[in-house]
Amino acid sequence: MKKRNITEFQVLSEIIRKQPHIKQKEIAENLGITVQAVSEHIRNLVKEGYVKSRGRGEYVVTEKGLRKLKNWISEFKDYLDEINTAVYRYKDIWPAIADEDVKDGETVYLFMKNGLLYASKQPKGEAKAKALYGGKKGEDIAICEIKGIIDVPKGKVIVFRIPPEVVGGSRAVDFNLIKENIDNLDDYVIATMGTVAYVVACKLGLKPDIRFAVPEAIVNACNRGCNVIALITGKMAEKVIKKLDNAKISYTVLDATKENK
């Protein structure tokens, strides 16, 4: 319905509620519009034959107007039903990444990987859902009717203490130590804190996933099932470690300073 039609529907509804004695000022106050606007809408309703004027402020809805009002009610109800459906569909639909090709309507099992929700046709745990809209492997799909609990084990953290610039910065880093430990992990998120740590990551060919609000972001990543490689400059590591302790997240701390020979 157009905005003008909605307002005329409201005016017509007010008339049928209070006919034949109509007070335009009262209608204007009820609808939050001006008296002039009410007067204009009434003139249009009379012109269209939906309302009949008896003079002296008396108006009655005609049979034609009654049919039109019923038609508007039906249209408005359909419109509200569409909105209501959209609201609840939005609320009940969740995105997931297809771990394999998934068709509309298929049952899928849900699991977390790299902090993202995946859907597979193979049992991956007790949580399952229905694929409302399927897709190819790696595409986003829409899932609904989620049942069960999605298992999200907490990730672990390896904290590398990176020497600050005053003791050599990246020039004093044992890059082999970092590489060896990274090679032992399959999936991980890279976090850097401090300029030197960022430079070290770049020299290792690593693209940091976390650079801002680092302690909090590391905890959030672990809570979503991600393992984290944290390159932290100097004393900043203490802040990260304290946050991990408070969140009861498992971690290992390694000093990445190169040994002097």
Swiss-Prot record:
GO biological process, one term: regulation of DNA-templated transcription
Entry GO MF terms: DNA binding
Annotated PANTHER family: BSR5907 PROTEIN, HTH CRP-TYPE DOMAIN-CONTAINING PROTEIN
Protein name: Uncharacterized protein MJ0558
Biological source species: Methanocaldococcus jannaschii (strain ATCC 43067 / DSM 2661 / JAL-1 / JCM 10045 / NBRC 100440) (Methanococcus jannaschii)
